[in-house]
A protein has these predicted regions:
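Beta-propeller domains
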Residues: 73-94
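C-terminal motif of bacterial Sec signal peptides marking the signal peptidase cleavage site
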Residues: 18-20
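Beta-rich, blade/repeat-based domains predominating
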Residues: 56-72, 98-117, 121, 140-158, ...
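A short loop-to-beta-strand structural motif that recurs across blades of beta-propeller domains
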Residues: 82-84, 121-123, 183-185, 223-225, ...
């Protein structure tokens, strides 16, 4: 497959981050040095050239995105409460500490990132960690649960999931849900709207290339669901089951599905369940890449759009595409 095959997807998945303390960037050698040891490409030999560890020594990595303005990746260490940037060479830069438990991110057309945080906020920031601004922390006057992952449409509409993970111990405070449900939300023209509240643990989210379908992973049911955006007229709509993920042969820790990305050919790359599953637009499995631990998320990017940054437990990996 040609490198240009994935180039469009690389531009469409980013964000920066977050919250309160710690301005200024700092180049560091944080994290252990890259082993650069090649790993299994599983059954994805037609798509993948190589999988290799880029850096380790973190707590729980999440929220990868490519920053095209600085030609580097941005990602979160959720439980380390820190946001990092990392160059393709492995050079690590600390962007923000005591950051608000940042999680998923996605890139807006103006080059800023939308960042979901487990401190119950949705924010924007630049790729260098500056310009932090709050977007939303409430819906209908009540606190959000813990914004988890983000996708941005071609018109800069923002879609995010709001499961309870951050208020169940994976954030700064334990609390009851103010709404009593986990939501999938849309932010557009300064307004926040509820798309769906039927999933108990909505996690990853990604929009289709034609902008008509939202893919949502529900960790607790091991499934991915679709939401028809053309049906949304301001009132929550139902979701339909798209695929159920099975554990990956040779993969390690096998939690339910997590982060999602849609490639330029419409295939869905789903993390979790011991690695990454690549699905066709009809939900059929194309291939799988095993990883030793649960994969929390992935993002297309790189200088030529032919790389993926994978976040998994205490490490980040690169996947080089054919």
């Amino acid at each position: 497959m040609r490198r240009s095959f994935f180039a469009n997807a690389a531009v469409a998945a980013g964000v920066v981050l977050l919250s309160a303390c710690g301005n200024g960037t700092q180049s560091t050698s944080d994290g252990e040095a890259s082993s650069n040891s090649a790993m299994s490409i599983g059954s994805c030999g037609d798509l993948v050239k190589e999988v290799a560890e880029l850096k380790d020594g973190f707590n729980w990595t999440e929220g990868p995105a490519w920053d095209p303005s600085l030609n580097r990746w941005v990602f979160s260490d959720v439980m380390g409460d820190t946001e990092y940037a990392i160059a393709p060479s492995g050079e690590l830069t600390t962007l923000r500490e005591k950051a608000g438990y940042p999680n998923g991110r996605a890139l807006l057309s103006n080059g800023t990132f939308v960042v979901a945080q487990h401190d119950r906020t949705l924010n924007t920031a630049k790729g260098n960690g500056e310009g932090f601004a709050l977007l939303f922390d409430t819906y209908e006057g009540k606190k959000l649960n813990s914004p988890n992952d983000v996708s941005v449409g071609s018109d800069d509409s923002i879609y995010f999931t709001d499961p309870p993970f951050g208020i169940q111990g994976f954030g700064p405070e334990k609390a009851e849900s103010a709404h009593g449900f986990s939501g999938v939300f849309k932010v557009s023209n300064g307004t926040i709207q509820l798309l769906n509240k039927d999933l108990a643990t909505p996690n990853g989210v990604a929009i289709s290339n034609d902008q008509n379908t939202l893919y949502i992973s529900d960790t607790g049911t091991n499934s991915i669901y679709t939401l028809d955006l053309s049906r949304f007229q301001g009132v929550p709509v139902t979701v339909e089951k798209f695929a159920e993920l099975m554990p990956i042969d040779g993969g390690g820790e096998s939690h339910g599905p997590d982060g999602l990305r849609v490639a330029s050919d419409g295939s869905i790359w789903a993390s979790g369940k011991g690695g990454i599953n690549v699905l066709k637009s009809d939900g059929a499995l194309t291939c799988s890449i095993p990883f030793p631990n649960h994969v929390s998320n992935l993002a297309f990017g790189g200088m030529y759009g032919n790389e993926i940054l994978v976040t998994s437990a205490d490490k980040v990996y690169t996947v080089n595409l054919k």
